[in-house]
């Protein structure tokens, strides 16, 4: 019973993701997020942080994995609340539209 | 698929919220990843730190925000007092007036090129001795003078007349000419100041006459010098010019016509005769290159006297007095200058000369 529920859950998520991509909503949301993050200075803050990290490690020894490990938590934390709220709102309306089908 | 979507509607809000959060986290992660790729590429390509500047230089180039200063911290109207030194006449001119001055001084205009050329040619013919030949070459070349392009072309066609007879760059010729001109300048007390005008007290009657046929000549009230501009100089009126001429040359002297004194490139028989005679002279000196200087000069003078009348008639514009003082310079200048057509008007002046 539990396994089937888990399975159903995963299937549902896959279906929603599929829908997001098919309708192009995911692409739109990504673009919106990008624009908002640049607008609010998230990118500049992160870049400053990047510089510190890179100087610390040395220019030659920087790898993408290092950067991702260092940057992603920071990036997630630095997203302003307003941006987060707006994005979540749009995701919810999308879900509501497609859940009612 | 249909079944699952139907089941979506049955999900409670908390489940939907969880999914929404998940999607959001996914998107943020995507953005972060994209940013990381961007930075990594910038680092590996070496342009990541390009926009960095060290704080010292940042301090140096800080934008200044003070009254009376521009953003670089300079007094913004200091250029008003700037002066430039003209490379041609060595006078210092206010920067805002420099371009118009240079145009006049270098002779880049239509009219001013004539004036400037005449001025330089005059001063060279009368003042210089050794470098006479080279300078004349430069002046008459006119390659650099935009306004006189047409003139230069005409001159080229003139040169066709000369070329078979003589080589203007022949060292022997220039040598003998230099010699002659050196003698001439010693005997010529004429002083010509290019920049300020002419003090007429120092001029002899012949020089005065030739000056007045080529230049405005009106005497300034302030400097007591004669105006060295063209006959049409806008600063003085025809009345003033006439008055000066009457004062110097007597009541018979009228204002010479400007048109006739300008170049007009016609060629008459006396010119070609003069050329032929010069050719003969050239040939003779070719035959005896070891001639002493004195014999050459006598030869030259003899030739000059023989063609004196035609010379002075052709070049009376500015060299008639020279042909009277010393014949050699008229020879030299005539060689470089275009032959001037006989100027029929203003007979009173020219009758005096001839």
From Swiss-Prot, chain A:
Keywords: Acetylation, Activator, Chromatin regulator, Isopeptide bond, mRNA transport, Nucleus, Protein transport, Transcription, Transcription regulation, Translocation, Transport, Ubl conjugation. Its main location: nucleus. It is found in: Nucleus, Nucleoplasm. GO terms for biological process: chromatin organization; negative regulation of insulin secretion involved in cellular response to glucose stimulus; poly(A)+ mRNA export from nucleus; positive regulation of DNA-templated transcription; protein transport; regulation of DNA repair; regulation of RNA splicing; regulation of transcription by RNA polymerase II. InterPro entries: TF_ENY2, TF_EnY2_sf. Pfam families: EnY2. There is a cross-link at residue 74 (Glycyl lysine isopeptide (Lys-Gly) (interchain with G-Cter in SUMO2)). GO terms for molecular function: chromatin binding; transcription coactivator activity. GO terms for cellular component: DUBm complex; mitochondrion; nuclear pore nuclear basket; nucleoplasm; SAGA complex; transcription export complex 2; transcription factor TFTC complex. Component of the nuclear pore complex (NPC)-associated TREX-2 complex (transcription and export complex 2), composed of at least ENY2, the isoform GANP of the MCM3AP gene, PCID2, SEM1, and either centrin CETN2 or CETN3. TREX-2 contains 2 ENY2 chains. The TREX-2 complex also associates with ALYREF/ALY and with the nucleoporin NUP153. Component of some SAGA transcription coactivator-HAT complexes, at least composed of ATXN7, ATXN7L3, ENY2, GCN5L2, SUPT3H/SPT3, TAF10, TRRAP and USP22. Belongs to the ENY2 family. Involved in mRNA export coupled transcription activation by association with both the TREX-2 and the SAGA complexes. The transcription regulatory histone acetylation (HAT) complex SAGA is a multiprotein complex that activates transcription by remodeling chromatin and mediating histone acetylation and deubiquitination. Within the SAGA complex, participates in a subcomplex that specifically deubiquitinates both histones H2A and H2B. The SAGA complex is recruited to specific gene promoters by activators such as MYC, where it is required for transcription. This is Transcription and mRNA export factor ENY2. It comes from Homo sapiens.
């Amino acid at each position: 019973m539990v396994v089937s529920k888990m399975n159903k859950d995963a299937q549902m998520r896959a279906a929603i993701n599929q829908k997001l991509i098919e309708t192009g909503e995911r692409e739109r949301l990504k673009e919106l997020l990008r624009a908002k993050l640049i607008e609010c200075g998230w990118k500049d803050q992160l870049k400053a942080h990047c510089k510190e990290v890179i100087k610390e490690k040395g220019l030659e020894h920087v790898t993408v994995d290092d950067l991702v490990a260092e940057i992603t938590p920071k990036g997630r934390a630095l997203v302003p609340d307003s941006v987060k709220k707006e994005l979540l709102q749009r995701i919810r309306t999308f879900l509501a539209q497609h859940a009612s089908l | 698929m249909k079944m699952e979507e139907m089941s979506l509607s049955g999900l409670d809000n908390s489940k939907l919220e969880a999914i929404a959060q998940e999607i959001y986290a996914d998107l943020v992660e995507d953005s972060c990843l994209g940013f990381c790729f961007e930075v990594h590429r910038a680092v590996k390509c070496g342009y990541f730190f390009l926009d960095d500047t060290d704080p010292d230089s940042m301090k140096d180039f800080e934008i200044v925000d003070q009254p009376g200063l521009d953003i670089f911290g300079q007094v913004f109207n200091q250029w008003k007092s700037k002066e430039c030194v003209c490379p041609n006449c060595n006078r210092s001119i206010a920067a805002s007036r420099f371009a118009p001055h240079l145009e006049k001084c270098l002779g880049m205009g239509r009219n001013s090129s004539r004036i400037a050329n005449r001025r330089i040619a005059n001063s060279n013919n009368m003042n210089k001795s050794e470098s006479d030949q080279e300078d004349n070459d430069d002046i008459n070349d006119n390659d650099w003078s935009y306004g006189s392009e047409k003139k230069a072309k005409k001159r080229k066609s003139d040169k066709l007349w000369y070329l078979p007879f003589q080589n203007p760059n022949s060292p022997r010729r220039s040598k003998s000419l230099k010699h002659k001109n050196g003698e001439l300048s010693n005997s010529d007390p004429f002083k010509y100041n290019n920049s300020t005008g002419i003090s007429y007290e120092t001029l002899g009657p012949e020089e005065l006459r030739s000056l007045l046929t080529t230049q405005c000549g009106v005497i300034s009230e302030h400097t007591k010098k004669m105006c060295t501009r063209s006959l049409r100089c806008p600063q003085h009126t025809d009345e003033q010019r006439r008055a000066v001429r009457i004062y110097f040359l007597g009541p018979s002297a009228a204002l010479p016509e400007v048109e006739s004194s300008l170049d007009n490139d016609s060629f008459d028989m006396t010119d070609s005769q003069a050329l032929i005679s010069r050719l003969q002279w050239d040939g003779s000196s070719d035959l005896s290159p070891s001639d002493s200087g004195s014999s050459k000069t006598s030869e030259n003078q003899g030739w000059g006297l023989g063609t004196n009348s035609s010379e002075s008639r052709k070049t009376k514009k500015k060299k008639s007095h020279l042909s009277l003082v010393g014949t050699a310079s008229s020879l030299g200048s005539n060689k470089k200058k275009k032959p001037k057509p006989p100027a029929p008007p203003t007979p009173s002046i020219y009758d005096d000369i001839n």
